[in-house]
Amino acid sequence: MSKQVLKVELREKTGKGICRRLRAAGRVPAVVYGKGITPVSISLGQKELSEAIAGEGGRNHILTLECAGELNGANVIVADLLRDSLRNQPRHVDLHKINLADKVKVHVKLNLVGTPAGVKAGGFLDFAMHEIEVECLPVHIPAHINVDVTELLIGHSVHVGEIAAPIGTAILSDPKAAVVSILGRKAVAEEEAAPAA
């Protein structure tokens, strides 16, 4: 997984008014927490944060903080990100301080590979689970996990337990949960009729 330096500023004052002023100045209020530390309020540039979490790995990039004080050089990952519903810009972020030698639990996006045989035969793809939870060392966090669906027929599904865990990772999500299914026309019609009943 990639590592990126992120310049942040410590903030002593908190509250709605302070956060509003930070956002108006192009900054995002944030909190850093983790094992053995007291939560620390910081702010960071909106543009820098957006660039840091853009791309394939998304929120799972390892970020190294650059600031005054004890947090300088700390490695973090995004634990929670609140976005503006209209402009989709970050409004607040929780950062989890990590130790590169300790395993972390993260959600990783699933990437469907191929066109299912069932879709070619007239079925419909139902992509129910877009990400799964994995546990691994931070350096082994995958950008995404590929799921090959080319052989998937109408009426069949791929479950979490059928997904191969990338090297160095353990999949924590329910192995019985359906990730993707191919539905026939009758099944789709029944699903559409069910909410109306």
UniProtKB/Swiss-Prot annotation:
One of its GO terms (biological process) is translation. Coiled coil: none annotated. It comes from the Bacteria. CDD domains: Ribosomal_L25_TL5_CTC. This is Large ribosomal subunit protein bL25. GO terms for cellular component: cytosolic large ribosomal subunit. Belongs to the bacterial ribosomal protein bL25 family. CTC subfamily. Pfam families: Ribosomal_L25p (PF01386), Ribosomal_TL5_C (PF14693). PANTHER family: RIBOSOMAL PROTEIN L25/GLN-TRNA SYNTHETASE, ANTI-CODON-BINDING DOMAIN-CONTAINING PROTEIN (PTHR33284), RIBOSOMAL PROTEIN L25_GLN-TRNA SYNTHETASE, ANTI-CODON-BINDING DOMAIN-CONTAINING PROTEIN (PTHR33284:SF1). This is one of the proteins that binds to the 5S RNA in the ribosome where it forms part of the central protuberance. The keyword Ion transport does not apply. Keywords: Ribonucleoprotein, Ribosomal protein, RNA-binding, rRNA-binding. InterPro entries: Rbsml_bL25/Gln-tRNA_synth_N, Ribosomal_bL25/Gln-tRNA_synth, Ribosomal_bL25_b-dom, Ribosomal_bL25_C, Ribosomal_bL25_long, Ribosomal_L25_dom, Ribosomal_uL5_bac-type. HAMAP family: Ribosomal_bL25_CTC. Disulfide bonds: none annotated. Part of the 50S ribosomal subunit; part of the 5S rRNA/L5/L18/L25 subcomplex. Contacts the 5S rRNA. Binds to the 5S rRNA independently of L5 and L18. GO terms for molecular function: 5S rRNA binding; structural constituent of ribosome.
